[in-house]
Regions:
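Short linear loop/turn motifs
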Residues: 88, 96, 192, 235-236, ...
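Short, glycine-/small- and polar/acidic-enriched structural segments
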Residues: 33-194, 199-204, 208-215, 234, ...
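Conserved C-terminal helix/tail region of periplasmic/extracytoplasmic solute-binding proteins
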Residues: 328-377
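Short helix-capping segments at alpha-helix termini
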Residues: 79-83, 180-185, 224-227, 293-297, ...
């Protein structure tokens, strides 16, 4: 009898273990909680079997930064999955390189500017790329100096030494900027360096000013110990060159073959953008969490995102037309300026580089009301 009781007790324990194992397995198959990393989401749509989703390969313009918050948020919250897409991304190595790789078909979509794309299209007419949405309404093209250099207006650049990498977009457009502000471009002595050394050359006094993106240069200068009031910034957009910033680019042949995929991507991306505008701190935190290297400087990324929020993402034009759109007259003027600045032989029109047919209805890409926008902290 004692042995029978012992065996029954053993069976009870066995079935109890089986029940626990089944319970544990059931719990393990539930939707993951949002952790801020790519692919994680509190949205059940994000857990859709990837076999049912269309893979979309995306390249960034450079290293992942806080400017990529709309993309990361849209991934995390399952917005792309809801549209039937499985989005993966890789870092870029500069706008021109990103466009080149897009043109070869290595990626399906990319974040870069239309102006370098114009130059690429002229050289590669059979691999043409087009912009399907504007993500930055104002370009961060700028010439930057330090107050200690005594350059207080653009005209003070006459006869100075400027520095930038050879392929830098703002450097290539500098003659147009010079024409607008009354600087003789022939009086400028250019020093060429690697992109990572640009701010170092300025800090060390090897150059009087640099050309580049304010979103890259200003965070680097602040990280090096400079204060905002120490930095002088001359934006091209404030000096006669009203360029758009980065866009969502696709290969023209891909867009024609996959119009619904492009539309789905753009729609989900701007849902992410709307969330970032509403809560930029959450967007910043999502990017920091997605950084697998864990080397990202949160303060520098905060500065970068703050610049974008104040002057690139939301402008009077975006408030009027919604995210993603482009003003035809403004864009054509900047295309013409690019043709002159880059020395292009062709004379492209807006339709040759930008299409709004992939944008969602205007009501789906409106700027959130000011009352719904939290400050960046």
């Amino acid at each position: 009898m004692i042995h029978r009781k012992a065996s029954l007790k053993g069976l009870s324990r066995f079935f109890l273990l089986l029940a626990c194992a089944a319970l544990f397995t059931g719990c393990a198959t539930q939707s993951p909680t949002a952790s801020g990393g790519p692919g994680s989401s509190a949205n059940p749509a994000a857990t859709t079997d990837k076999k049912d989703l269309k893979d979309v390969r995306v390249q960034l313009s450079f290293l992942m930064q806080s400017l990529d918050a709309p993309l990361i948020v849209a991934i995390n919250k399952g917005y792309f999955a809801e549209e039937g897409l499985n989005v993966s991304f890789e870092r870029g190595f500069g706008n021109a390189d990103t466009i080149s790789k897009l043109g070869t078909g290595k990626f399906d979509m990319a974040f870069s500017d239309m102006y370098n794309a114009l130059e690429f299209n002229e050289k590669n007419p059979n691999d043409k790329v087009i912009a399907v949405a504007v993500t930055q309404n104002k370009a961060p093209f700028a010439v930057l100096s330090l107050k200690e250099r005594g350059i207080s207006s653009p005209k003070d650049l006459n006869g100075k030494k400027l520095g930038a990498p050879a392929g830098d977009g703002p450097r290539k457009l500098f003659p147009l900027f010079a024409q607008e502000v009354g600087v003789d471009p022939k009086s400028i002595e250019w020093t060429t360096m690697e992109p990572k050394l640009r701010e170092t050359f300025l800090l060390q006094g090897k150059v009087d000013a640099i050309s580049g993106f304010s979103t890259s240069a200003i965070p680097s200068l602040l990280k090096a110990g400079k204060k905002p009031e120490d930095i002088t910034t001359f934006y091209y957009t404030e000096n006669g060159l009203d360029f758009y910033g980065n866009t969502i680019l696709v290969k023209d042949s891909f867009a024609k073959a996959n119009p619904e995929v492009v539309k789905a991507f753009v729609k989900a991306y701007f849902r992410g953008m709307q969330d970032v505008i509403k809560d930029p701190t959450a967007g910043l935190d999502a990017v920091i969490a997605a950084d697998q290297s864990k080397l990202m400087d949160r303060q520098a990324e905060k500065v970068r995102l703050d610049i974008a929020l104040k002057s690139m993402y939301v402008t009077p034009e975006v408030e009027k037309n919604g995210f993603g759109a482009a003003d035809t007259a403004r864009l054509q003027e900047t295309i013409d300026q690019t043709v002159a600045g880059f020395g292009l032989k062709s004379k492209p029109q807006v339709a040759d580089i930008f299409s709004d047919q992939f944008l969602p209805p205007k009501e789906q890409r409106q700027v959130p009301p000011a009352a719904e926008r939290k400050p960046l902290s």
